[in-house]
């Protein structure tokens, strides 16, 4: 599917879902200002932690690949790639459209675009259409835990599983300069249903050109 990477304000992406689940009312309103063109999205080119994650992404995927190549289930955690599967990275994009008002029609004005851009994915064989697992890479601080990393970015992973119609995602994390760990995360239908409700509520405010919440600027 053709995706305009310069048109992120035309829908909701994975990073937006972090705000929708973990953010405050002020965070929602700030996101609304970006989506409606009132403010520019933050520039991440000088954010050290963001750029470090980008630079170490390939090494992150290398560490993950070595573990998934293992024949031991305790190491590959039930997601072996061996010779029948392969990891791909780069230019993995897709969109999914849902109704803004569930009881409404499917005309363009009632459609919300959910956007997905993956760090990587596992495919069956050489078939670029046969995806079987999403990969999300993060470089976090040394004393963080894998459980906390998954909890923080679960909205993003569940969003991607929804967009790409997948049942599994891998959180692949580098912890400071100490170690690499990963975990397979299953699709959570109840969570996705709740997330879509938040996405619809938020996007209705974008369409109406009215902030999601009336709050004092204190």
Where are the predicted features?
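Helix-loop elements that line ligand-binding/catalytic pockets
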Residues: 207-218
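Signature of the catalytic double-stranded beta-helix
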Residues: 53-74
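Nucleic-acid nuclease catalytic cores
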Residues: 68, 72-207
């Amino acid at each position: 599917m053709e995706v305009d990477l310069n048109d992120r304000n035309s829908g909701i992406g994975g990073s937006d879902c972090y705000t929708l689940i973990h953010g405050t009312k002020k965070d929602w309103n700030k996101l609304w200002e970006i989506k409606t063109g009132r403010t520019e999205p933050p520039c991440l080119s000088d954010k050290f932690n963001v750029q470090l994650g980008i630079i170490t992404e390939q090494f992150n995927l290398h560490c993950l690949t070595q573990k998934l190549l293992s024949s031991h289930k305790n190491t590959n955690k039930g997601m072996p790639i061996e010779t029948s599967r392969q990891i791909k990275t780069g230019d993995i994009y897709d969109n999914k459209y849902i109704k803004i008002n569930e009881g409404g029609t499917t005309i363009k004005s009632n459609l919300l675009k959910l956007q997905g851009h993956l760090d990587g994915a596992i495919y069956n064989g050489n078939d670029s259409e046969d995806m079987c697992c999403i990969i999300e890479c993060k470089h976090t601080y040394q004393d963080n835990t894998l459980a906390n990393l998954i909890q923080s970015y679960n909205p993003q992973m569940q969003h991607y599983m929804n967009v790409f119609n997948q049942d599994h995602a891998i959180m692949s994390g580098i912890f400071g300069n100490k170690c690499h760990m990963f975990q397979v995360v299953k699709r959570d239908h109840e969570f996705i249903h709740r997330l879509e409700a938040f996405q619809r509520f938020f996007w209705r405010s974008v369409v109406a050109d009215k902030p999601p919440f009336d709050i004092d600027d204190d």
